[in-house]
Curated annotation (Swiss-Prot):
It comes from Xenopus laevis (African clawed frog). Residues 103-132, 363-485 form a coiled coil. One of its GO terms (molecular function) is zinc ion binding. Residues 56-66, 1015-1031 have a biased composition (Polar residues). This is Rho GTPase-activating protein 45. Residues 1-99, 414-444, 564-595, 981-1036 are annotated as: Disordered. Residues 261-524 form the F-BAR domain. The keyword Glycoprotein does not apply. SMART domains: C1 (SM00109), FCH (SM00055), RhoGAP (SM00324). It is found in: Cytoplasm; Cell projection, Ruffle membrane.
């Protein structure tokens, strides 16, 4: 019975199926094959395993990546037969991006389509249950074809050799090899489907990023020259076998991958297999105990270190920050903060490991493991005891049977001899012998029956032991798998926590290192000396002092003293005094002095005031201003000069930012009036909380770290900054309708900055920006909106932000409903020639080809269905791309290249299934064709009728818009559209001075100075309405005869009071026809009067504002 059971075990489905798909020849008889012939190697099965121990203890290389672990296969060693490339491709530099020829794109997309077909075929073969015995070799063959095609693509384009791609490939290989083709298991099907979808999505995203020039260099496999174990050749080369190579993935899966069946069969066949499994389970429990003890003690050490580090930081934090203006003080302050945060992170991670992720699950699993192991062991020992009892009874029965048989044989012999000797003896003796023989026979038969019963019982117990053995081995395997699962999740969580805990350290140390390199020697000492604000040391004079009587003879008489003492007289070393000035000083000391109650204002360079009439004021009256007064004076001076000269910069830059003026500030940070942070807030630059060493703006309430002021990109809007706006991934219409021109401000700002600085930059929109800077720019746009300052941002980062915004729209700029029509139109345009490239797109005017012209007309009709805001934005964006393509000789960005980049960003199919996204890559040439057509035939597709009003006011409106946006310091907001025309204004009649009433005297500010010859005139002016602080009404201007009054006084030598009066500094010129600078122009400023609560100006070239 035992032998029959053994034969049944040998004929299990797994072994029979494996033998039917087994190796056709031993490994030594295999001929050497090239690495590219991977389909035959994948289709073939491994050679017969004669030593399961050796195959079960395979050692992987130390440089094994996570894709090999996921695949469950060993990679070939450097001494293997796999082909090695001559050089290892290195990731591209940050400044140069990958370029691919337009001709190669179609070939690449063809390979992608074939790869998608191989994956579809592999899925059909694996899921087809009708194939039965041929499913395994066919699946291996399909997998080999897909991997061979994938390797060819990666060899041709090394930038596709990413960790994610190889990880997905390794996972797919392991799922195909470990699939149970004999029995349909739902878990295997789900795992296989998930691996297939992951492979398709990963390869699709990698191809998309490669075509758009956005391959992240951090995901590339940068291999040392001697280590090729993480390449695609190693992944496929390890599968093809050969001399000196490790066993293939198929061998590994069949020898150690079929954990469910092969391991049990091996242990069932081997002597002492259950004892070995129980011993392994016992050792595993001990291993879990030692491992948890190690992690616990290590966690305790880290907690002690964290507590000691926090204690050290708290002890020295106040000491190091006590003195100001010390070298590297900000660096070490940041380092202390990082150490404090690191200590908090260590304590948090330790508590998490103790109670959630590692120690508690491992200890609970170890206890359960021990309990189950003892139960299984008791079950096995109980079955063994039953078999031993049956075998003992069998031995006793066999001995009794032999003894009774021998006695029966002896009795039978005695009875036979008694019959022969019957003549010599009596019948009584013969009967006695016969009865003895009969009793011996009965006892022998009874012993034989007992013996047979014991044999049957022993066989039964043996069979039960075999059944218990199978059950015990299965339970032990499940127990070990469960423990492995818990240990794997705990290990992953542990090292992920360690990574999250230690990852910020190198970044922080690198930041501190780079900041330390920027320190200039003696910088803080110089800052310390400058902030002292020390008064000049007074000159000490040693002069003769005459004796003064102590007794005053008359209380009404006292000595007359000079207004200035000897210390107030400037020394000859600092100031040379002419003889005339000394005479004036002596007269001022002895003679009569005239005291005034107001200060005398003297303008430098005033020709009407000579140096002789200027009194020599003592130096004590010229003390330097305090830092705050100096800052205010500089700010007022700068504002005055800009207002007088009519200059309005694109960015308001303050001269000082309070207590943070001595650190390096970005251009946007200089626009804020900063003070020390009073309450904890969230930093608008790094999006983390600010507790200490923070700054906030007095006007817009922006909060920021002190270290983040160097990179701040949000300008001051002179009003409270709004909360964070969800910008990326938001519906396009919601963002577009917030702008007056229905174009999102992000698109307009990025495009304007790129057109200003990067139209001739090589590879614009193709070279990838730095990922961290791009994320910071996106965050700045969401925090600051239109106030983001982009003059210091890299153009490649700006292009990345623009593409990222377009790609993350829930519905693309060209809606889903137009996608099929556009793709059909593109396919129709490419179907014209034999090569599949279609006619060349070229705008020849009236001589344009008929086919091309029909495509353009159909495209124009399709775009008529776009919503207004989508069409406006698309037109604006395509116009910008036209300007970029006009510089093709310098930036290498032709319309076709721009189509490749912006095709997937402007249009995409409606999302359905993951595998469809891989097939949609075939539409890339069609998307690029549509965008290329839009760029080349922009004037035809987006042509609009131009009215006379638009011609007359278009330029002025755009100029007014730019001027209004650049004048941020006046705090003026636009209330109406700048292109709107203002109504007519009727200028009232100015009254005669004699006829002015009391009311007019109280309301007119100097109106009596206006000549009575001015007449009312009706003027029509295209004025822009502005929301002022004092009044929102429109300001008329005065023309005609009043202007001649200013022209008649142009030749007078006396300067206009408006040039020196700060009350006139807001009278700013709005026309730019004067080519002479304002400070050289001798034209007097026009008169400005206020009557009846309104401002009247005598020239349309001036626009006053209240400040």
């Amino acid at each position: 019975m035992f032998s029959r059971k053994k034969r049944e075990l040998m004929k299990t489905p797994s072994l029979s199926k494996k033998s039917r798909a087994g190796s056709p020849a031993p490994q030594n008889d295999l001929t050497r094959k090239d690495v590219t012939d991977s389909s035959n190697d994948l289709a073939s099965s491994p050679p017969s395993n004669s030593s399961p121990v050796s195959s079960g203890t395979l050692k992987r290389p130390s440089s094994l990546s996570r894709h090999a672990s996921a695949a469950g296969i060993p990679l070939s060693s450097p001494r293997g037969k796999a082909t090695k490339p001559a050089s290892t491709p290195s990731p591209p530099e940050s400044g140069e991006g990958p370029f691919i020829d337009v001709e190669d794109i179609s070939q690449l997309l063809g390979d992608v389509a074939r790869f998608a077909e191989r994956l579809e075929k592999l899925r059909d073969v694996v899921q087809d249950e009708e194939l039965k015995e041929t499913r395994r070799p066919l699946a291996h063959e399909c997998l080999g074809e897909a991997l061979r095609l994938l390797r060819q693509v990666i060899n041709k384009y090394p930038l596709l050799n990413t960790v994610e791609t190889l990880t997905a490939a390794g996972t797919l290989i392991s799922k195909v090899k470990g699939f149970h083709y004999e029995s349909s298991i739902e878990n295997d099907k789900r795992d296989f489907e998930k691996a297939l979808e992951s492979m398709a999505v990963c390869f699709s995203s990698t191809i998309s990023e490669f075509l758009m020039g956005e391959v992240d260099s951090s995901t590339l496999l940068s291999l040392p020259p001697g280590d090729q174990s993480q390449s695609m050749e190693s992944l496929c080369g390890g599968l093809s076998g050969g001399e000196g190579a490790l066993p293939s993935a198929h061998e590994y899966v069949e020898a150690g991958g079929h954990l469910g069946e092969d391991v049990d069969v091996i242990l069932q066949r081997s002597d002492g297999g259950v004892q070995a499994a129980l011993l392994y389970a016992k050792n595993m429990a001990k291993y879990l105990k030692d491992l948890s003890s190690y992690i616990e003690k290590r966690t305790i050490l880290e907690m002690e270190y964290a507590k000691g580090l926090q204690k050290l930081v708290n002890a020295y934090k106040g000491t190091l920050n006590q003195e100001t203006h010390m070298p590297f003080q900000s660096i070490y302050s940041v380092a202390l903060e990082q150490d404090l945060e690191h200590g908090h992170g260590i304590l948090h991670t330790a508590l998490t490991l103790q109670h959630q992720t590692f120690l508690q699950p491992i200890n609970m699993r170890r206890q359960e493991h021990e309990k189950r192991r003892k139960e299984v062991k008791e079950q096995w020992q109980r079955a063994q005891r039953k078999l031993m009892e049956a075998e003992s009874n069998l031995r006793k029965a066999r001995q009794a049977y032999m003894q009774r048989s021998e006695e029966h044989e002896r009795a039978l012999y005695n009875a036979t001899r008694a019959e022969e000797e019957q003549s010599h003896s009596g019948t009584r003796s013969l009967d006695k012998k016969r009865r003895a023989e009969e009793e011996a026979k009965n006892r022998a038969e009874e012993a034989m029956a007992t013996y047979r019963t014991c044999i049957a019982d022993a066989k039964t117990q043996k069979q039960e032991l075999e059944d218990v053995k199978v059950n015990v081995l299965r339970q032990l395997q499940e127990l070990i798998k469960q423990s492995d699962q818990i240990l794997r999740s705990a290990t992953i969580s542990y090292y992920q926590s360690m990574h999250m805990q230690t990852a910020p350290l190198p970044v922080g140390f690198q930041m501190l290192c780079e900041s330390s390199k920027l320190y200039d020697l003696g910088q803080q000492y110089a800052s310390y000396v400058r902030q002292l604000g020390a008064v000049n040391e007074p000159e000490t004079s040693y002069d003769f002092q005459p004796y003064t009587p102590q007794i005053t003879w008359s209380p009404c008489i006292r000595a007359r003293k000079s207004s200035f003492n000897s210390q107030d007289i400037p020394s000859s070393e600092n100031k040379e005094i002419s003889g005339e000035e000394r005479g004036v000083e002596r007269r001022g000391g002895r003679g009569h002095q005239v005291h005034k109650s107001w200060p005398t204002a003297i303008t430098e360079g005033d020709p009407a005031v000579s140096s002789a009439t200027v009194p020599a004021f003592p130096e004590k009256l010229h003390q330097p201003l305090s830092p705050t007064e100096n800052v205010d004076q500089k700010r007022l001076s700068a504002s005055f000069e800009q207002s007088i000269n009519g200059l309005s910069g694109s960015l308001e830059v303050q001269n000082s930012t309070g207590p943070f003026r001595n650190i390096g500030l970005s251009r946007a940070a200089l626009t804020h009036r900063l003070r020390k942070l009073r309450t904890p807030s969230k930093c608008r630059e790094c999006n983390s909380y600010v507790y200490f060493q923070g700054a906030e703006c007095e006007e817009c309430s922006l909060a920021c770290h002190k270290k983040c002021l160097e990179t701040l990109a949000i300008q001051c809007g002179h009003k409270k900054l709004q909360g964070r706006l969800l910008l990326f991934g938001r519906d396009f219409s919601e963002t577009a309708l917030r702008s007056p021109d229905h174009i999102p401000f992000l698109i307009r700002k990025c495009v304007s900055e790129i057109e200003e600085r990067a139209l001739i930059m090589k590879g614009i929109y193709r070279v990838n920006g730095v990922k961290t800077r791009v994320e910071k720019l996106c965050q700045a746009f969401e925090n600051g909106k239109e106030l983001v300052e982009l003059s210091q941002a890299s153009p490649h980062d700006l292009s990345n932000v623009l593409k990222l915004y377009l790609r993350q729209l829930p519905e693309p700029l060209i809606p889903f409903r137009l996608y099929n029509g556009l793709m059909g139109l593109a396919k129709e345009s490419l179907r014209g020639t034999e090569t599949g490239k279609g006619p060349r797109l070229q705008d020849k005017g009236p001589n344009t080809e008929t086919d091309v012209l029909s495509i353009v007309v159909q495209l124009k009709e399709l775009l008529q269905d776009l919503p207004s805001e989508n069409r406006t934005t698309l037109q604006y964006l395509v116009k910008h791309l036209c300007r970029v393509s006009e510089q093709e000789q310098l930036n290498k960005m032709s319309p076709s290249n721009l189509g490749i980049v912006f095709g997937p960003a402007l249009m995409r199919p409606r999302p359905t299934d993951a595998t469809v996204s891989l097939s949609s890559l075939v539409d890339y040439p069609h998307q690029a064709r549509i965008v290329e057509t839009l760029i080349i035939f922009y004037s035809t597709i987006f042509q609009e009728p131009v009215s006379n009003t638009d011609i007359g006011t278009g330029n002025s409106s755009s100029d007014d818009t730019a001027s209004m946006q650049s004048r941020a310091r006046l705090q003026v907001t636009v209330e109406e559209d700048l292109s709107e025309l203002t109504p007519e204004y009727q200028i009232p009649v100015f009254k005669e001075p004699g006829a002015s009433t009391v009311e007019s005297d109280s309301e007119s500010d100097g109106a009596e100075d206006i000549p009575g010859t001015w007449k009312p005139q009706t003027t029509r002016g295209h004025l822009t309405k502005e929301a002022s602080v004092t009044s929102a009404e429109d300001i008329p201007y005065i023309e005609g005869e009043a202007q001649s009054e200013s022209e008649e006084d142009r030749d007078q030598t006396q300067e206009n009071l408006a040039e020196n009066n700060t009350n006139q500094s807001n009278n700013v010129a709005v026309n730019g026809h004067c080519c002479v600078p304002h400070f050289h122009c001798h034209t007097q400023l026009p008169a400005i009067r206020m009557m009846h609560g309104k401002i009247y100006v005598s020239s349309a070239d001036r626009r006053p504002h209240f400040v």
